[in-house]
Every structure is written in C-alpha cells, then in structure tokens.
C-alpha cells in the first residue's frame, strides 16, 4: 500500500518538531505560511515566553491551546506532544483559521 500524506493539501497548518525543537515535518500550508523550516529549530521563530512554554510541553507532556488574531485573521493554535513507544518524541502544532462567526454547541 502506498503511503498517503493525509495532511498535504488540507486547510490547516501542521508543523511537527522532534524533542529538541527541530522541525521534522511541515505540510504545504505550514511551509506556505512560515517558509520551509525543515531541519531548523522552531525556537527562534517564537518569543521567549513561547519558547518557555514549548520547553514545558516537551518536558511535561502538556497541551497548549489558544486563539490569536493577526492581520484580521483569527486562528486557533493547538500544540500537543506526539509519542514514540510512550516517550515524548516532539510536538505537533495545528494552526487553524477560524471563521468570523462560528457556532458553539453544548451537547449532553
């Protein structure tokens, strides 16, 4: 069976780093947004506070989720560890553009 890159053409930016913070994968949307960062550290792309959060996520296995607005575009950022045989292998970051209006449903 051929391997399929399910993330290649989707409208979500996906960036994956190893446990040192080196980018090991970007889908097309991530590369178009940030440039090709494969093989480079993602830390210089972030402010000091964000670098500290990234280190905490890598060390403790926490997840960091928040929304931002930049140049009038709202995004949800979701950073979470990925694991290899139960050990943190690095982080995966999803950056999702949010519509101007988005319904919120409470379900029981």
List each model region and its residues.
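C-terminal end-of-chain micro-motif
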Residues: 1, 107-108
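Sensory modules in modular signal-transduction proteins
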Residues: 1-25
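Sensory/regulatory domains in signal-transduction proteins
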Residues: 29-107
């Amino acid at each position: 069976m051929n391997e399929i890159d399910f993330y290649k053409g989707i409208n979500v930016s996906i960036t994956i780093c190893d446990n040192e913070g080196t980018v090991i994968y970007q889908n097309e949307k991530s590369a178009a947004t940030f440039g090709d960062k494969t093989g480079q550290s993602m830390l210089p792309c972030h402010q000091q506070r964000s670098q500290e959060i990234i280190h905490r996520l890598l060390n403790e296995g926490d997840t960091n989720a928040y929304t931002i607005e930049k140049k009038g575009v709202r995004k949800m950022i979701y950073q979470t560890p990925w694991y290899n045989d139960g050990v943190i292998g690095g982080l995966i970051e999803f950056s999702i553009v949010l519509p101007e209006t988005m319904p919120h449903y409470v379900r029981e």
